[in-house]
């Protein structure tokens, strides 16, 4: 078991090392990115499935995963949040992403993010998800 952490201008190697001391029972894998956050280009959904903008984050970094790939022009929608029971919170206005999610068996739940977009905020910037770890 493990987690992926984006190594970026926001989260450096020292921060990742500190995080790994608190998660000593999990493998912490750093993924170098030029994005502000790794979530700007991909998000974990469930069952080893990710939504990903492959022009921003290489799917090859995540061996063994399945992908819902979205086009570059809708890359903002890669910052998504899995809500459970197949529902995925996504920004509104990205019809290709919604279609691909539905085709993959998910139910997109759209929310207006237009004001947050102006400040580079995505869906996951508005929440602090807590997952059952054990």
Briefly describe each language-model feature range.
Residues 1-134:
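Histidine/cysteine-enriched polar flanking segments
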């Amino acid at each position: 078991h493990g987690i992926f952490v984006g190594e970026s201008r926001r989260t450096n190697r020292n921060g990742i090392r500190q995080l790994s001391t608190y998660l000593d029972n999990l493998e912490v894998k750093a993924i170098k990115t030029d994005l502000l956050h790794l979530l700007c280009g991909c998000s974990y959904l469930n069952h080893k499935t990710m939504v990903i903008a492959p022009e921003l984050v290489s799917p090859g970094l995540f061996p063994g995963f399945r992908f819902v790939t979205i086009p570059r022009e809708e890359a903002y929608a890669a910052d998504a949040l899995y809500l459970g029971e197949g529902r995925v919170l996504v920004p509104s206005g990205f019809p290709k992403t919604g279609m691909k999610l539905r085709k993959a068996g998910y139910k997109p739940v759209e929310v207006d993010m237009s004001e947050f977009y102006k400040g580079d905020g995505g869906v996951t910037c508005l929440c602090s998800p807590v997952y059952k770890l054990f």
